Amino acid sequence: RVADEPVLHERTGALLEPTTPVVIGVGQVVRRTPDLDAPVEPVASAVEALRAAERDAGVEVLGRADLVYAVPSASWTYPDQAGLVASLVGAEEAGTVQTSAYGGDGGQLAMNDAADRIVSGDAHVVLVSGAEAGATVAALQVQGREPEWTRQPDDAAPDRVIGVDRPANNEAETSVGLGAPIYVYALIESALRGAAGTDEAEHRAAIADLWARHSAVAAANPYAWDPTARTAE
């Protein structure tokens, strides 16, 4: 229930407006070793994570969602992933929102839009979801198999799509093989180094230090894909 008056935040003593966005539950799922006898599709992992978030919240909220967001999977395409998630968690009446397929900022876009909808009073309970199964798809491809996962009608669509919905690469990039992000990132790093005026050794050391700190964060999260702390060396 949404309060009628500002709510006291006990730890800080601050008064919060009733429409202040609050994250009440978080859930994560990781499958480092694919089960090729019963391959789990992305939307199933997304639902599993949402159920974990509901347990984390300590209150049943999934079926009460006003909006369901989905960051679309790159490993298996669902035209309306948000709608599929909504139906699987019992929120069939919820509005559905999906971020655009490319950009890498889908998670943050979804959180920003969800917060805006809560502040405006358009929604009170919002679910934000996303999942991948790239390792499973790759392992199946090695065996010459294709996943037998959910296929929606081509005309299935969420209520809204947010983000820039355009091809990931233009013709010039594609013509010289700049398709995968790993190639483009290398060019960006070279441009950053040039702009900063540092030499290769300095820039390499800075990147190594950054990723060493990233790995320390991952090592503290049992749901990280590679929870191994690594040094800059």
Show which residues each predicted segment covers.
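Short helix-initiation/N-cap motifs at beta->coil->alpha
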Residues: 103-104
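Conserved phosphate-binding catalytic cores of ATP/NTP-utilizing and phosphoryl-transfer enzymes
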Residues: 107-116
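Conserved "HGTGT" condensation-loop signature of ketosynthase/thiolase-family condensing enzymes
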Residues: 1-100, 116-123, 127-233
